[in-house]
Amino acid sequence: MAIKMDKNFTLEILNLLKNNVLKNRLKIGKELTEMLIDEIDKLIETANEISEEISKNSPNNSSLYDLRLIYNKLSTLYEDIDKLLGEIECILSLSNKDIKNWKLWKNLGDKAYLWKAYYEALFCYNKALELNQNTELLCKKGYALLKLYKRDLAIKYFEKASEKDRNNYKALFGLGKSYYLMSDNKNSIKYFEKVLELNPNDVEALEYLGELYYEEDCEKAINYFKKALELKPDDIDLILKVAFTYFKLKKYKHALKYFEKALKLNPNVFELEQIYESMGRIYIYLGEDEKAIECFEKLKEINLYHYEIYEIIALTYEEVGNIEKAKEFYKKLV
């Protein structure tokens, strides 16, 4: 559905959507109804705030961009709810025997999840959970909630699953991921370490732990990244994480080794920029100016904003105390 960018029309659609959800609340279920109403209310509030800002000031690119985001979210939500209500009508027309089969609801939820219809998946998992409160369903609901950014609620269901089975891998991983997304590093580390107790070779958990330790303890971070890399030796993302962690630790020769390894794996343009910029800076730190300039020349072939590169070079020379060289490149910015 294409929503035209008009405040009154938008609010009218949002209120119609809200009324439609409330009218079908018995079919949708209390929890899912509250979630949908909360999403609609947030959009109404934000749309009003942005429209008020635009009416007071001349529209700028930022406010118009924010408004476009609201319309995009509204279009997506409208389609999701419309599809959900349509699917509910079809699903509830099933035979009485099928409606009482939790596995059927689980399968319908899995299918919806696969198609990224997360509200529909939640509806089906809710129906399945009414019939069977097993750990698999609790975790499936938790992951569907994560997809909808309902992290607090997701934690509630992962915890329920964990209470039933303290060593449930999916529940522990879900808790680790939920806390990671909430920037609660302490709890995220706690649960990902529990995941590793169950499976020391879980690459995702190792990578998450590397990222969680990166800011506070690079030595621990590098250990986790390298363990993950042993299991996925050609993963360029992991190779670069190892390289950048060594760079942060000022272990420049180790960092170069991994940046060079990444270059052999056909990195994309964004990765190439990161690699050549980092290698150029490292060679300056090591006093190997010729190699540094070679890297920055390659960077110039990728990044057309050469003044940014000159500024990076100048700042790096300034960092190592070579003021004359820094001045040379600052002049190129003029």
Swiss-Prot record:
Q: Does Transcription count among this protein's keywords?
A: no
Alphabetical UniProt keywords: Repeat, TPR repeat
The domain of life for this entry's organism is Archaea
Q: Where are the TPR repeats?
A: 102-135, 137-168, 169-202, 204-235, 236-269, 273-306, 308-333
Under InterPro entries, the record lists: TPR-like_helical_dom_sf, TPR_rpt
Name under which the protein is recorded = TPR repeat-containing protein MJ0798
Q: What is the species listed in this Swiss-Prot or TrEMBL entry?
A: Methanocaldococcus jannaschii (strain ATCC 43067 / DSM 2661 / JAL-1 / JCM 10045 / NBRC 100440)
Instruction: Provide the taxonomic classification.
Output: Archaea, Methanobacteriati, Methanobacteriota, Methanomada group, Methanococci
